[in-house]
């Protein structure tokens, strides 16, 4: 089984991915695929450099490019693990690419949802170089993500984890999802 994690920036995808890893479930990061590609091409791993690489690979491989870059890692991990998590799926084209490449695998989309206010506060605390510093920048970034297609992926998710009530509740929601997976209920 492949779980495709999606969610708006600051929703908690990385936190959820780390919780899966703590339970021995391997995680492949779509963002890492872009960072690795930047390194191969000798492009700095700055926000501008990563955006440049993202655009170039999409020009070369099509709109599902980042998924294409992660397929070899996912395939290798599936040889040894019953479940693999892919963190950071952002477009319907990427979901379609995984479905095309892994026809014999069960694929589920898991969306992490948080309110805009909660996400903005998390991004301010996180302080990554590419995180918005103002509400206006945050709204613009959300608009770009939605134009990219992430809203459609979230809307069509098989399972939604709400991340509003603190870390303990988030962990409980993740535990519930993992139990459902291994009990064959998802």
UniProtKB/Swiss-Prot annotation:
<protein>
    <recommendedName>
        <fullName>UPF0200 protein PF1294</fullName>
    </recommendedName>
</protein>
<dbReference type="Pfam" id="PF13207">
    <property type="entry name" value="AAA_17"/>
</dbReference>
<keyword id="KW-0067">ATP-binding</keyword>
<dbReference type="InterPro" id="IPR027417">
    <property type="entry name" value="P-loop_NTPase"/>
</dbReference>
<keyword id="KW-0547">Nucleotide-binding</keyword>
<dbReference type="InterPro" id="IPR022970">
    <property type="entry name" value="NTP_hydrolase-rel"/>
</dbReference>
<feature type="binding site">
    <location>
        <begin position="7"/>
        <end position="14"/>
    </location>
    <ligand>
        <name>ATP</name>
    </ligand>
</feature>
<dbReference type="GO" id="GO:0005524">
    <property type="term" value="F:ATP binding"/>
</dbReference>
<comment type="similarity">
    <text>Belongs to the UPF0200 family.</text>
</comment>
